[in-house]
């Protein structure tokens, strides 16, 4: 097979490419220039598209004896990922830019270009597994190392995208094993630290970064009764479940801390309350997609058992789900959680599993609490 290896400049993508070469495939490496402006390239940053990352990717390809290219996807990345991130926060929602990038860039723009150029597949350093059922349908599963598993952020992939995707690290037991393999192979990135921040916010200060992009207007912080308990410098920078950064002039009657329960961007207010009010037992999701072929119960519109996960490394909880339609006739995923989840925010993604298999995902529109009404952004 002719395989395009996406090279981030990190240890995972380097070892993934090495394993693909070792498997006998014809491999070409490509580094994606994503968040840079034309004519610039950042240095000394923890984000993506640094000179160091590009150099590390080139060194890995040179060591493996494969061609290396840099493709500039910065304009599409800005439009589909960065601008979307800003718009979602401006609307009071909490987006997942990594999932958006996988959906629009790595497994859309990159994969489309790869196939157009005659490649059979794209391989990445994601910790996940693609499998085929007895009928030849492609499925997405968790990786062997659940601590590093990234199937959550790949839950947006379609059957056709899975068909052309390779995840060579699917059977890696630990990250330490991957680093040791990189060291044995003489790859210079063996000890390179992992990246944990949003790649286009290099200093990790999401709130400060958003303040430069969104018109932040001071407003009121209210408790669940509607009484003013503090002020904020901009409602758009908060997310449901947040505690830090709240300026509360009036302490709670019980003396316990309060958390963000709701963001009302039209009113420029933030609603806070006790931690127990963050517990949600019903999620309603829009923009539904299925990883591979939908399960039979979905087509029948009946309720099915699953595990629901709302954060990349969050704990999945047992649930029952079904698909219905909203008032406008659009598909709506309803997930009833057996065990409540804390701080479920509109804009986040709920991913459904059965065993290790990813069933699909939806963007959270509303979440209903055990003790309150619903959290919704209009």
UniProtKB/Swiss-Prot annotation:
Gene Ontology MF term list: ATP binding; tRNA binding; tRNA-uridine 2-sulfurtransferase activity
SS bond partners: 101-199
Function: Catalyzes the 2-thiolation of uridine at the wobble position (U34) of tRNA, leading to the formation of s(2)U34.
Keywords attached to this entry: ATP-binding, Cytoplasm, Disulfide bond, Nucleotide-binding, RNA-binding, Transferase, tRNA processing, tRNA-binding
Gene this chain is encoded by: mnmA
Similarity comment text for this entry: Belongs to the MnmA/TRMU family.
Assigned GO CC terms: cytoplasm
Binding site for ATP: 6-13, 32, 125
Pfam families: tRNA_Me_trans (PF03054), tRNA_Me_trans_C (PF20258), tRNA_Me_trans_M (PF20259)
GO BP terms, alphabetized: tRNA wobble position uridine thiolation
Top-level enzyme category: transferase
Protein name in UniProt: tRNA-specific 2-thiouridylase MnmA
Catalytic activity: S-sulfanyl-L-cysteinyl-[protein] + uridine(34) in tRNA + AH2 + ATP = 2-thiouridine(34) in tRNA + L-cysteinyl-[protein] + A + AMP + diphosphate + H(+)
InterPro entries noted in UniProt: MnmA-like, MnmA-like_C, MnmA-like_central, MnmA-like_central_sf, Rossmann-like_a/b/a_fold
Superkingdom in the source lineage: Bacteria
Active site (catalytic residues): 101, 199
Record-annotated site: Interaction with tRNA: 126, 348
Key word Nucleotide-binding present: yes
Ranges where the record places region Interaction with tRNA: 148-150
